[in-house]
Amino acid sequence: MKILYISPENTVGTLNLWKHIHEKNGHNCRFITFFPSPKKYGDDICLNLPFDFTKKRLANWRHQFYKIYRGRTGYYTEKKGYPPVWTPEGKIDKLFFIMKDVTWKRKVEKSIDNFDLLNFDVYHFESGMDFFKDSSFAQKIKKRGKKIICHYHGEDLRTRGVMPELDAVSDLNLTSEVDLLGKHPNINYLFLPFDTDSFTTKQKLNNPVRVCHAPTNRYYKGSAAIIAICKKLVSDGIIVFDLIENLPHKEALNRKLEGDIFIDQIGDKGGWGYGMNSVESLSMGICTLTMLNETYQNFIPDHPFVNVDETNLENKLLFLINNPEQIKIHGNKGKEWVVQKHHYTNVGKKLYEYYQKDGIVN
């Protein structure tokens, strides 16, 4: 079987792992991305297209522009609907996407021919996104009897919505975000895959304790409050604080490895619970703090996280610092849990269960 992943970019390295998982199962797998990996993960087929809205300047421009249509919260405004459905916000928005598709068309069609992209058996559309806004590629392969999977990661479904033509032909919908389970009538949960064996468990704590935070989006993570609280503890001589941002992935990992406590997020603005940042820190055996609402706690009742929010973060940090054995206990529990839930072998087995259940494979 030949499997193709189509994605805006290789954001957190999972495309490499999916390729590895499928090849271990005896299948051929490739992935094609619109833009280069921002954190220098390896790319397979990269189109290097224009209009990369994952870049900060363009993302901010889009956010400010969408305030015209959505109000103060701009692009971050969650769309309503079950599922939410993408439509252009207005005439300017519509004209832009027409122009973008025209600009992309020649390079995309050349790549379809050069890499024989019409002759795969299974197609994963990461972020539920085709090359084109009308999902013409997905419709073409569906007519050829191909199987289509859409995997949603957060913002794509919360603030953009499903692409209606692609959603209509999808055989299987997946997400690794618990809140998205309530935003689509036909979607399944899958833990993020990770090579949890990449790191040995941390044994020795720093003195003073080293606290890390590595936001990809400060607004989503509640970083302003996290940074303010940690800077206060630094000024009191209680901790060392490492803010890890805008670095190649390898360098960011090396910085995280030096930490004793990792803070993921303290709000639900950009998705609930935790993401790849926490998966990495748990795999390192690092005590990991994040906000888990009641729904998320019920979804993973055996979780290893220290549950925090803006009102209790400082006190919980002080408790851990004054009880360093608790830092180690949470770190060791986290390592065991992340192997069980996120090791790529276990996640791959679950994906193939969905494949069989939904008739993707016999």
Task: Describe each model-derived feature in a short phrase.
Residues 4, 201-221, 227:
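Conserved donor-binding/catalytic core segment of Leloir-type glycosyltransferases
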Residues 149, 156-157, 167-201:
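Donor nucleotide-sugar binding/catalytic pocket of nucleotide-sugar-dependent glycosyltransferases
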Residues 1-47:
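N-terminal subdomain of nucleotide-sugar transferases
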Residues 2-7, 96-100, 113-132:
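Short N-terminal targeting/anchoring amphipathic segment
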Residues 122-128, 138-157, 173-175:
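Active-site proximal beta-strand in glycosyltransferases
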Residues 281-290:
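Short hydrophobic beta-strand element within catalytic cores of glycosyltransferases
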Residues 325-356:
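A charged, aromatic-enriched C-terminal amphipathic alpha-helix characteristic of glycosyltransferases
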